């Protein structure tokens, strides 16, 4: 049995899609649907059961899991970089993850954890996923810090020898529609361009970057789940790994690709960055991918323009935009 936490969320539901593509339906989806629209991510998917997060955690605490678990793909977390409730993040992103990791170590199940590129802070220490760099990182927000704390715990307790913790960079693609302000700029741009014919980006607050010239490592969600599938097939590959393309692109590049995919000429305006983001905004991210490549991962990452075009034309513009 495969357990996917956050299985109704963005990357989690994409992982359920990938498992289905590989002929696997013995899947338990763990999530907290509440009043969100996440349930729509599951309509096209095949799985044997859905369990609420709190019920699942009670099962874990009391050793009452009714399944023979092959792997836990742990994508369940609060992923809002603007979340300010530190206690909530500690409980949801740190303690929850540690419990699942210990469960898998005890039972021999594969454990794949979602870390984040937010752990890299302002990027002044670079974006290397080696252990020495990890020990020195200073995240800019509580979300990144909660992810950093799990990686540090796993390192300190010797757990990184038996798990894979993945630092996802800027992920975009289908099934992110429920995320509100945390949706990718591609998703937001498609709606804004369709309604107004223009896309607005934040002005740069960094002297080294022009407006819209701030750079991110944008990775297509289908590539993320290809990496996770490969890790499921290669349980001897363990540690903290970056999951990006290794090639940073500008916000202007990204938005221009959306306009092109919509067969429109780019019209971009720049607005002031909100005060609460200043000093906490990464002007540049680019994954160092040597570690994953050296481990033998064969996944070829989708070029930005190709990924954006597929996302826009095959999903955002479709009657059924879901995987």
From Swiss-Prot:
Q: How is the cofactor bound?
A: Binds 1 NADP(+) per subunit.
Q: Which cofactor does it need?
A: NADP(+)
Q: Where does NADP(+) bind?
A: 10-11, 31-32, 38, 53, 75-79, 92, 147, 171, 179
Residues annotated as the enzyme's active site: 143, 179
**Keyword Ion transport among record annotations:** no
Q: Under the GO molecular function aspect, what terms does this record hold?
A: ADP-glyceromanno-heptose 6-epimerase activity; NADP binding
CDD domains named among the record's database cross-references: ADP_GME_SDR_e
Q: Which InterPro entries match?
A: Epimerase_deHydtase, Heptose_epim, NAD(P)-bd_dom_sf
What superkingdom heads the lineage? Answer: Bacteria
> EC annotation?
5.1.3.20
Which pathway does the database say it acts in? Nucleotide-sugar biosynthesis; ADP-L-glycero-beta-D-manno-heptose biosynthesis; ADP-L-glycero-beta-D-manno-heptose from D-glycero-beta-D-manno-heptose 7-phosphate: step 4/4
Q: Which GO terms describe its biological process?
A: ADP-L-glycero-beta-D-manno-heptose biosynthetic process; carbohydrate metabolic process
Give yes or no: UniProt keyword Isomerase. Answer: yes
Which residues are substrate-binding? 170, 181, 188, 202-205, 216, 281
Q: What job does the chain carry out?
A: Catalyzes the interconversion between ADP-D-glycero-beta-D-manno-heptose and ADP-L-glycero-beta-D-manno-heptose via an epimerization at carbon 6 of the heptose.
Q: What is this protein called?
A: ADP-L-glycero-D-manno-heptose-6-epimerase
Organism the protein comes from: Nitratidesulfovibrio vulgaris (strain DP4)
> What gene does the UniProt entry assign to this protein?
hldD
């Amino acid at each position: 049995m495969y357990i996917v936490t956050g299985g109704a969320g963005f990357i989690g539901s994409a992982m359920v899609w990938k498992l289905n593509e590989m002929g696997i339906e013995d899947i338990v989806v763990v999530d907290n649907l509440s009043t969100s629209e996440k349930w729509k991510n599951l309509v096209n998917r095949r799985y044997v059961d859905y369990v609420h997060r709190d019920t699942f955690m009670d099962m874990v605490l009391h050793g009452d899991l009714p399944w023979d678990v092959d792997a836990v793909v742990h994508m369940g977390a609060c992923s809002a970089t603007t979340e300010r409730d530190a206690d909530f993040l500690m409980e949801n992103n740190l303690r929850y993850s540690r419990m699942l990791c210990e469960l898998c170590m005890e039972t021999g199940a594969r454990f794949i954890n979602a870390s984040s590129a937010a752990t890299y802070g302002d990027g002044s220490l670079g974006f290397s996923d080696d252990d020495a760099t990890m020990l020195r990182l200073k995240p800019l927000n509580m979300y990144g810090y909660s992810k950093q704390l799990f990686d540090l715990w796993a390192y300190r307790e010797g757990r990184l020898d038996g798990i894979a913790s993945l630092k996802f960079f800027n992920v975009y693609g289908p099934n992110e529609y429920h995320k509100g302000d945390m949706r990718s700029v591609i998703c937001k741009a498609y709606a804004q361009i369709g309604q107004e014919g223009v896309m607005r980006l934040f002005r740069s607050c960094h002297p080294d970057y022009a407006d819209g010239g701030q750079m991110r490592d944008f990775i297509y969600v289908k590539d993320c789940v290809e990496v996770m599938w490969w890790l499921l097939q290669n349980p001897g590959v363990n540690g903290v790994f970056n999951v990006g393309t290794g090639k940073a692109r500008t916000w202007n590049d990204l938005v221009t690709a959306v306009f092109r995919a919509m067969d429109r000429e780019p019209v971009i305006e720049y607005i002031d960055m909100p005060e609460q983001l200043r000093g906490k905004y990464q002007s540049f991210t680019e994954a160092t991918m040597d570690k994953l490549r050296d481990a033998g991962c064969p996944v070829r990452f989708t070029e930005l323009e190709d990924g954006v075009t597929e996302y826009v034309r095959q999903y955002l513009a479709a009657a059924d935009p879901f995987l």
